[in-house]
């Protein structure tokens, strides 16, 4: 009889986004999404955080493809209104999608997209 091993505990997933300018990306996330600027390493890598969410940035090199992330929002209306008031680039407005989620899309200055949603 085989015995299943329990997995060791791991922490949260931290996305690393490709950006054209790390410091500019940090400032953009601070100003339009209310993240706090974290560390910066020689202009090549850096981080921001908000609550339990952290994002790393790395200066992009070809070939480049933007990243997509799904972000659950407990209060989707408040999140939408907050980000809209901050001037976030909302490329798809808040609406109920055919697949049942209420969601909206924010695109950052480097084309990375965030699908904010609530079930």
Please provide the spans of the model-predicted regions.
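Conserved short beta-strand elements that form part of the metal-binding/catalytic scaffold
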Residues: 36-67, 113-118
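Conserved acetyl-CoA-binding loop of GNAT-fold acetyltransferases
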Residues: 31-38, 88-89
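N-terminal beta-strand motif that seeds the catalytic metal site of vicinal oxygen chelate
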Residues: 1-26, 67-69
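Vicinal oxygen chelate
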Residues: 22, 69-113
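Short beta->alpha transition motifs characteristic of CBS
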Residues: 16-18, 98, 116-119
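Residue-level marker for the onset of beta-strands and adjacent loop->beta junctions
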Residues: 13, 44, 67, 100-102
């Amino acid at each position: 009889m085989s015995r299943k091993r329990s997995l060791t505990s791991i922490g949260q997933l931290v996305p690393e986004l490709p950006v054209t300018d790390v410091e500019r990306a940090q400032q953009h996330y601070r100003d339009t999404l209310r993240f706090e600027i974290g560390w910066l390493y020689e202009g090549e890598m850096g981080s921001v955080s908000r609550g339990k969410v952290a994002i790393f940035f790395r200066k992009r090199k070809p070939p480049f493809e933007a990243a997509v992330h799904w972000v659950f929002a407990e209060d989707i209306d408040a999140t939408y209104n907050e980000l809209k008031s901050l001037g976030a680039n909302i490329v798809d407005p808040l609406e109920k999608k055919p697949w049942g989620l209420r969601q909206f899309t924010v695109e950052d200055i480097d084309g990375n997209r965030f699908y904010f949603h609530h079930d």
